[in-house]
């Protein structure tokens, strides 16, 4: 998994936001692995990197919690907004089935923390009406395939929508290396 973070507002983790995520882990009866905490800290500093860990060890939450912590830190003591943030995270994965699984995992954390974020998928299977809706108002996090992203990049409104993008995650990147799809 490759994670590219924005260096726009590099900073360190604030206790309150990280504590919210750590508490969520406790409710699941999980302990975050050191690599997850290290990933969150690196994200807070605006660093990019590669997450390499065995299947089932929490790479998704390692990459996902960083942008959420960053957003909660930015929010500070302000009241929770009712409207979701604009597109901040682009999550690219090569397999449609993985798009569904990833979207479910990302939504779980957002819903459990009661954050106003929207997490949506966009693949060749996504209906035209949903794609049209997304082009008018992108979700906070878009989970997509390389092919759907290529098409999306051809639309003029995408440049504006991507202007607030803070994090790009390329999941299962090794699946793309030996194909025409590329990374």
Residue ranges and their predicted role:
Residues 1-38:
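N-terminal intrinsically disordered, low-complexity tails of helicases
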């Amino acid at each position: 998994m490759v994670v590219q973070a924005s260096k726009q507002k590099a900073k360190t983790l604030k206790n309150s936001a990280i504590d919210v995520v750590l508490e969520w882990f406790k409710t699941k009866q999980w302990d975050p692995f050191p690599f997850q905490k290290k990933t969150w800290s690196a994200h807070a500093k605006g660093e990019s990197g590669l997450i390499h860990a065995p299947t089932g060890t929490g790479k998704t939450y390692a990459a996902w919690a960083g942008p959420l912590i960053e957003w909660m830190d930015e929010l500070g003591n302000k009241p929770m907004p009712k409207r979701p943030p604009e597109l901040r995270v682009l999550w690219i994965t090569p397999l449609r089935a993985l798009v569904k699984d990833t979207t479910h995992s990302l939504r779980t954390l957002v819903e459990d923390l009661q954050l106003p974020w929207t997490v949506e998928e966009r693949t060749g299977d996504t209906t035209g009406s949903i794609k049209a809706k997304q082009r008018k108002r992108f979700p906070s996090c878009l989970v997509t395939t390389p092919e759907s992203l290529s098409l999306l990049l051809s639309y003029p409104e995408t440049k504006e929508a991507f202007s607030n993008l803070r994090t790009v995650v390329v999941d299962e990147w090794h699946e793309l290396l030996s194909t025409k799809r590329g990374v």
